[in-house]
């Protein structure tokens, strides 16, 4: 019998009983499918060429709030409270310090909600809790605060290229702000997007992106808006396959079996390593489903266009949250993290890593743990992740250049690093799935903390080279587009100082994880 536990509507309880899935998960999927249809309608009948930005903002906001109340009931008021108070802080605190005040309040409010949900209501229950959307709203609030701070307080020469490209030069109106944080396309599962990208989409400027010509220069083509139909269809196919895999295979390979006493006592090391990998592999399709569906919804509305490739084919991956092929074929810890929950990784980079004055890696992992929630397993995963990241970086910097030639040696190196990466990632994230301290330590004990020990030895024995903070190619493409939009809004390229002083950095989210599809 499917559970009837939900804070939202029980209208779909008969469907929940029929498919034997919890009502909160049914509500989430049905609302996302409704959002998909609404997105098609929004792009067709409320296109920026047919209606004003005001109407598009209002409709996107009202639909988003309706979906939120349907899924979460009165708990959805937290979305408005958190967003509303943060907006007031932006106005009152001023552009000099608003980013710090908004960061502390938004993250603190999220943490309080997570603590009450976990330790007062349903510890260990992966329901479609209201803190999931709040995680995305928190990303948007803090991103916008830093972006306004960068655009209205700091001098251009003080900004990095990424910060300069995403800087917001004027204070958003209340409607623009609420539309950005609570629109129907991203209210339930994200992903995070930058404020400038969202406003460009609403105002109809996002599709006017220059296409690279044969001589390498950008040319503005006078073609109609690119159609997202092919991209949406492809992503819906991925959603269907991911959901099918999750409903059929995932339950046959539970992560908890890694700490089964009989399995630990009888399984050989190759068997343990193999099952560890396949059980964590089977745990990923639920994320593939949720994030890819969220991406498809945004694309169906016309949001997510990132220009054309060299063949003139439209790309709809501006706010994509993952790259499945790169994840499954990752040959380094960094490669895996760069392609998993992409928008959240960008948020962490922009609000923490690039701004940290010391130990940026440690601070970033700590912020990630706080943002994800209060389960002890999260912190154990991210503490382990810091160790694994530093060790993997040291190994790569010291040895990779020896294996680049000939191609056969490079292939051998890639195979070995693929195996090492997949086992290390699986080993690291087991506590994230198990949640609690005791089962997590039971797992690590059964492995004799071997990867922890190896990582410590690597850091002690190998010289550690400091890595430079770089901007990715995708980010550079996005920033060049953002710069064009910014110049269009502010032709003189000057910082405008408003009486509503505020501050904001750059952030593109990511989505974040949606609890309804987490074990």
From Swiss-Prot:
Subcellular location: Endoplasmic reticulum membrane
GO molecular function terms noted in the UniProt entry: 1-acylglycerophosphocholine O-acyltransferase activity; 1-acylglycerophosphoethanolamine O-acyltransferase activity; 1-acylglycerophosphoserine O-acyltransferase activity
GO CC annotation: endoplasmic reticulum membrane
InterPro entries: LPLAT_7/PORCN-like (IPR049941), MBOAT_fam (IPR004299)
Chief location of this protein within or outside the cell: endoplasmic reticulum
Entry annotation: catalytic residues: 341, 372
Known regulation of activity: Partially inhibited by thimerosal.
Matches recorded under Pfam families: MBOAT
Region (Disordered): 497-519
UniProt keyword terms in alphabetical order: Acyltransferase, Endoplasmic reticulum, Lipid biosynthesis, Lipid metabolism, Membrane, Phospholipid biosynthesis, Phospholipid metabolism, Transferase, Transmembrane, Transmembrane helix
Induction (free text): Increased during chondrogenic differentiation.
Superkingdom of origin: Eukaryota
Catalysed reactions listed for this entry: a 1-acyl-sn-glycero-3-phosphocholine + an acyl-CoA = a 1,2-diacyl-sn-glycero-3-phosphocholine + CoA; a 1-acyl-sn-glycero-3-phosphoethanolamine + an acyl-CoA = a 1,2-diacyl-sn-glycero-3-phosphoethanolamine + CoA; a 1-O-(1Z-alkenyl)-sn-glycero-3-phosphocholine + (9Z)-octadecenoyl-CoA = 1-O-(1Z)-alkenyl-2-(9Z)-octadecenoyl-sn-glycero-3-phosphocholine + CoA; a 1-O-(1Z-alkenyl)-sn-glycero-3-phosphoethanolamine + (9Z)-octadecenoyl-CoA = 1-O-(1Z)-alkenyl-2-(9Z)-octadecenoyl-sn-glycero-3-phosphoethanolamine + CoA
EC number, UniProt record: 2.3.1.-, 2.3.1.23, 2.3.1.n7
TM stretches of this protein: 22-42, 61-81, 88-108, 184-204, 236-256, 263-283, 365-385, 415-435, 443-463
Family statement drawn from the similarity comment of this UniProt entry: Belongs to the membrane-bound acyltransferase family.
Protein name per its UniProtKB record: Membrane-bound glycerophospholipid O-acyltransferase 2
Species, as recorded: Mus musculus (Mouse)
Organismal lineage: Eukaryota, Metazoa, Chordata, Craniata, Vertebrata
The gene coding this protein: Mboat2
């Amino acid at each position: 019998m499917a559970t009837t536990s939900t804070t939202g509507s029980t209208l779909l309880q008969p469907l929940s009983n029929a498919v034997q899935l919890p009502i909160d998960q049914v509500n989430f999927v049905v609302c996302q499918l409704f959002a998909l249809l609404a997105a098609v309608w929004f792009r067709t009948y409320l296109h920026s060429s047919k209606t004003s930005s005001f109407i598009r903002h209002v409709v996107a906001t009202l639909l988003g709030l309706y979906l939120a109340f349907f899924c979460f009931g009165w708990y959805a008021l937290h979305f408005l409270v958190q967003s509303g108070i943060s907006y007031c802080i932006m106005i009152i605190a001023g552009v000099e310090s608003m980013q710090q005040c908004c960061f502390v309040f938004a993250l603190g409010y999220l943490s309080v909600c997570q603590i009450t949900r976990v330790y007062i209501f349903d510890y260990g229950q992966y329901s479609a809790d209201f803190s999931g959307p709040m995680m995305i709203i928190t990303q948007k609030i803090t991103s916008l605060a830093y972006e306004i701070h960068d655009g209205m307080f700091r001098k251009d020469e003080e900004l990095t290229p990424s910060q300069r490209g995403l800087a917001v030069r004027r204070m958003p109106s209340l409607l623009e702000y609420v539309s950005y944080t609570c629109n129907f396309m991203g209210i339930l599962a994200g992903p995070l997007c930058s404020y400038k990208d969202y406003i460009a989409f609403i105002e109809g400027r996002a599709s006017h992106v220059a296409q690279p010509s044969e001589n390498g220069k950008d040319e503005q083509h006078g073609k109609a808006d690119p159609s997202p139909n092919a991209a949406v269809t492809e992503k819906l196919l991925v959603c269907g396959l991911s959901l099918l895999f999750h409903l059929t295979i995932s339950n046959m390979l539970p992560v908890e079996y890694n700490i089964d006493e009989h399995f630990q006592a009888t399984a050989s090391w190759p068997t343990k390593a193999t099952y560890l990998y396949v059980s964590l592999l089977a745990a990923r399709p639920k994320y593939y489903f949720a994030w890819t569906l969220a991406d498809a919804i945004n694309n169906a509305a016309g949001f997510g266009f990132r220009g054309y490739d060299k063949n003139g084919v439209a790309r709809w991956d501006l706010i994509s949250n993952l790259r499945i092929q790169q994840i499954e074929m990752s040959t380094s810890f960094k490669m895996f993290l760069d392609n998993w929950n992409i928008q959240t990784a960008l948020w962490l980079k922009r609000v923490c890593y690039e701004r940290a004055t010391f130990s940026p890696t440690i601070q970033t992992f700590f912020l990630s743990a706080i943002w994800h929630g209060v389960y002890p397993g999260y912190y154990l995963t991210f503490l382990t992740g810091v160790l694994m990241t530093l060790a993997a970086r040291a190994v790569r910097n010291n040895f990779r250049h020896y294996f680049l030639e000939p191609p056969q040696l490079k292939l051998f190196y890639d195979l070995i690093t693929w195996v090492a990466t997949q086992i290390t990632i699986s080993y690291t994230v087991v506590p994230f799935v198990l949640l609690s301290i005791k089962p997590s330590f039971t797992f690590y004990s059964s492995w004799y903390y071997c990867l922890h020990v190896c990582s410590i030895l690597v850091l002690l024995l190998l010289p550690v080279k400091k890595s430079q903070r770089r901007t990715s190619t995708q980010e550079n493409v996005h920033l060049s587009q953002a710069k064009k939009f910014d110049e269009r809004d502010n032709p003189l390229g000057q910082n405008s100082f408003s009486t509503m002083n505020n501050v904001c950095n750059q952030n593109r989210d990511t989505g974040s994880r949606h609890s309804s599809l987490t074990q």
